[in-house]
Regions:
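Conserved active-site and cofactor/substrate-binding residues in soluble primary-metabolism enzymes
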Residues: 7-11, 15, 38, 133-140, ...
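Short alpha-helical basic/polar micro-motif
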Residues: 28, 34, 136
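Rossmann-like NAD(P)-binding element
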Residues: 1-27
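Alpha-helical scaffold segments in soluble metabolic enzymes
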Residues: 15, 19, 42, 69, ...
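Short C-terminal domain-edge/linker segments immediately following a structured domain
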Residues: 20-21, 60-63, 114-116, 196-197
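Short amphipathic alpha-helical segments, especially helix-boundary/capping motifs
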Residues: 15-20, 41-45, 111-118
């Protein structure tokens, strides 16, 4: 569904990206439409803005959903204090149950539950739009504007990739953590998939 939205949303975001270029816009250009990460790259290409000016907001809801499952299932409880969310929201999401005591199988199970939680809500007859609007949109945007740690997509290695970061006077500060090899491999796979999207 998200990639089906890409063509139309890319056209729309390109209009605003060109307006930003024409007006020599110097603020943040924040993308909240799906698919967030590829649209950020489209904005960067069309706008002439610096990569630090473009930011995507889609990962916050994935982090919030992971917290929900971590509170409900003791197997995922380590996510509450040591867990992290990376990448886009959707199929290429990467969750780590813990960065200190990473369990690949548990992390993949949590990732699968979170990535498909919206489908479970739809089965119950609800369209999940409030949680993303708050977690990825309003709350994450406010944290970003205040210079506080939050989940958003920033430019990294030629793609926009979601991770915990904050805006400082010097630019974007990404959270730096020692990551286990299995987690690094998952992140590389996600980056490669994002890079393949035109």
């Amino acid at each position: 569904v998200r990639m089906a939205q890409y063509g139309l949303n890319r056209e729309l975001v390109s209009i605003y990206a060109r307006m930003a270029r024409d007006r020599r816009y110097r603020g943040l250009f924040c993308v909240v439409s799906d698919p967030v990460d590829p649209l950020c790259r489209a904005v960067l290409r069309e706008s002439g803005l610096s990569p630090a000016q473009v930011r995507g907001f889609g990962l916050g809801v994935m982090h919030a959903r992971a917290l929900y499952y971590a509170r409900r299932d003791p197997r995922f409880a380590s996510y509450l204090t040591e867990g992290r969310a990376f990448g886009p929201h959707g199929e290429d999401l990467v969750l780590a149950n813990s960065v200190a005591h990473y369990d690949d199988a548990l992390s993949r199970e949590l990732t699968d539950k979170v990535a498909h939680a919206n489908l479970e809500m739809r089965k119950l007859g609800y369209k999940p739009y409030v949680a993303p609007a708050l977690s990825s949109g309003a709350l994450s945007l406010l944290l970003c504007l205040r210079g506080q740690w939050h989940c958003s997509s920033t430019y990294l290695g030629g793609v926009f990739m979601g991770a915990r970061n904050r805006v400082t006077a010097a630019g974007t500060e990404l959270e730096r953590l020692p990551l286990p090899r299995q987690l690094q491999d998952r992140l590389q796979t996600t980056m490669d998939r994002l890079r393949a999207i035109d």
